[in-house]
Amino acid sequence: MNGMAVVMIIRKYFLIIALLVMPWLAIPSVSAADKGGFNTFTDNVAETWRQPEHYDLYVPAITWHARFAYDKEKTDRYNERPWGVGFGQSRWDDKGNWHGLYMMAFKDSFNKWEPIGGYGWEKTWRPLEDDNFRLGLGFTAGVTARDNWNYIPIPVLLPLASIGYGPATFQMTYIPGSYNNGNVYFAWMRFQF
C-alpha cells in the first residue's frame, strides 16, 4: 500500500470519527452537580476538542501477542513492530488528570495499515517530589478498522496505562480476546508539544 492510500484511509476514518464526536460538541455545559456519567464523558470530550493545552505526536512502539494465547506458528508470522504515526490534542484537568483526542495509523499484526482514533482519559499520580514524573491509569474509547475485516469501523473500549516524564509518555493498552485472536499488548510513545 502506498503513502497516498494510507492518507485516504486516514481521511475516510477521521471523517467517521468526527461525525461521531460532533454531536457531543453541541451539548451545552452544565454544572458539576447536575452531571451524570455520560454527560461528564461528553463534556470532557468537548472541552478537550475546544480547549486543548497541547498537541501530541504518537509513535507506535510495540505490539506483543500473548504467547499463552496463540499457536507458535501464528506468532512467528505476526508483525510486532507497528510502524506508524499519530497526532492528537490533549489537556490536563484541574485534578491533574489527562484527557486526549487522537488519530493514529500503524501496521497491524498482518503488516496492513490500521487506523484508530478516539478519546483517552487517565487518572494521573505523581508519586515523587518531582512533578514531571507521573503514572496514569484510565481508558480509551474510539473506533478502529482492520484490513482483515474489510475496514469496517469497529468501536473499541480499552484500558490505558502510562509512565511519563515531562513531555514524553510511554502509553499502553491491552486488547483482550480468545485463543488465536486478540490478547495483544500495544504500546506507543506520546510526545506533548
From Swiss-Prot:
The record marks K74 as: Role in lipopolysaccharide recognition. GO terms for biological process: lipid A biosynthetic process. GO terms for cellular component: cell outer membrane. The record marks Y179 as: Role in the phospholipid gating. GO terms for molecular function: acyltransferase activity. It catalyses: a lipid A + a 1,2-diacyl-sn-glycero-3-phosphocholine = a hepta-acyl lipid A + a 2-acyl-sn-glycero-3-phosphocholine; a lipid IVA + a 1,2-diacyl-sn-glycero-3-phosphocholine = a lipid IVB + a 2-acyl-sn-glycero-3-phosphocholine; a lipid IIA + a 1,2-diacyl-sn-glycero-3-phosphocholine = a lipid IIB + a 2-acyl-sn-glycero-3-phosphocholine. It comes from the Bacteria. InterPro entries: LipidA_acyl_PagP, OMP/PagP_b-brl. Keywords: Acyltransferase, Cell outer membrane, Membrane, Signal, Transferase. It is found in: Cell outer membrane. The active site is at H65, D108, S109. Its EC number is 2.3.1.251. The keyword Transferase applies. Residues 1-32 form the signal peptide. It holds the Pfam family PagP. HAMAP family: PagP_transferase. Belongs to the lipid A palmitoyltransferase family. Transfers a fatty acid residue from the sn-1 position of a phospholipid to the N-linked hydroxyfatty acid chain on the proximal unit of lipid A or its precursors. This is Lipid A acyltransferase PagP.
